[in-house]
Amino acid sequence: YNSYMHGRQYYYGLSLGAAYKFSDNFSAFAGVRGVYASTNYYGYVEDIKVGNMPLYKVLDPTKETAANIELSCDQSGVGFTPIIGVDFKTGKWNFAAKYEFKTRIRLKNKSVNQVPSIGNLPDNLRNAYIAGGVPEAAANAIIGNPDIQGAMGQLKTEFDTKLEKAIGEYEDGKKIAGDIPAYLALGVGYSPVDAVRVNVGFHWFDDKHATSYNNRQEKLKRGTLEYNAGVEVDVNKKITLSTGWQNTNYGLPDENLDTPASKRYMDDKSFVVSSNSVAVGGVYHINKKMDLNVAYFHTFYQHKKTSEMVQLSAEKSINYSSDYTRNNNVFAVGLDINF
C-alpha cells in the first residue's frame, strides 16, 4: 500500500494575571490563560493489497478506489488554564516556581473522510463465483454456508474495529478529548558577577492525567520530565551571548512482542521520543528600547523501538518492528520593543 499523512496544530493563548510584591525579596503571581486550539489533518492509504490481490477487487471490483482510506479533518476547541507562581530573590540568587493547572479542551471534528466498507463482501464473492462459471445455485449455497457466514461476520467485525482504531478519532461531528497537561516549573538563577547569569530548571508535565482520545494517556508510565541549564554573558554594552541545554524524558511504556495492544502507546499517527537539545543565541542591544534577538537550536532525538506480532491467519503470523525518531533544527529572529 501507499500512505501519506500531514498535520498542523496551532494553540493560541491570551493570558491575564496580576503580581504582588510582598517584600523586597518575595513576590507572587496569579492569572489565567485562555487557549484556542485549531488543528488540521490530511492523509490517505491507497493501493491496499491482500497478498498480491488488490483489496478493491474484493470490496467492489468496479471501483478501483473502493478500498482507499482518506482523511481530511479540522478540529477546534477552547480551554482555560489557571496559573500561579512565586519568586524569591536573595543576594546573587533567584528562586522561582510556577504551576499551570490542567487545561480541559474538547476538540470538535469537522471531517470529510472516505472509508471502505466490506458490507457488500458476500454479494461481491457470489458475483465473482458466478462470473467464474459456478452455477448460481451453487454460489448461493457456498455463500449461505453457516461457516462461511460466520467467517465473513468475524472478518467484518475485525475490519471495522481496526478501521475505528485507525481513524475513529477523526469522525465527523465527534468531540475529542485533547487536554493540555498540568505543568510544574522550578528554576534557580545565580549571577556571580553582573555580566554573567547562570540558570538551571526542572519541568514536570502531568501527561498521565491529561485526558486524550480513548484514554491513551493511561498507557504511559509517568509524566514528562525536563531538565534545563543555560548561561548568559554580557560581552559588552551592545552584545549578549547565551547557550543552553535541555533534556526531555517521556514516560513511555516498553513495547515488546508480548505487549498487548491495549498497552501500546506509539503509532504511526502520533508518537514522541525522548531527546537532548542544545542552543546558542545572541542579543544586539540597538538602543534602550530595542533589542535584536537571534538563536539556533538542534534537538538530538533518541530512537524508540517497538515490536509486535501480527496474526495473519490461524496458522501464520509475522513479527512487525518499528523504529520511531525524528529530526529538528530551529532558527529564530526576534525584535523586542520596550515602550
Which positions does each model-derived feature cover?
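Outer-membrane beta-barrel porins/channels
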Residues: Y1-F339
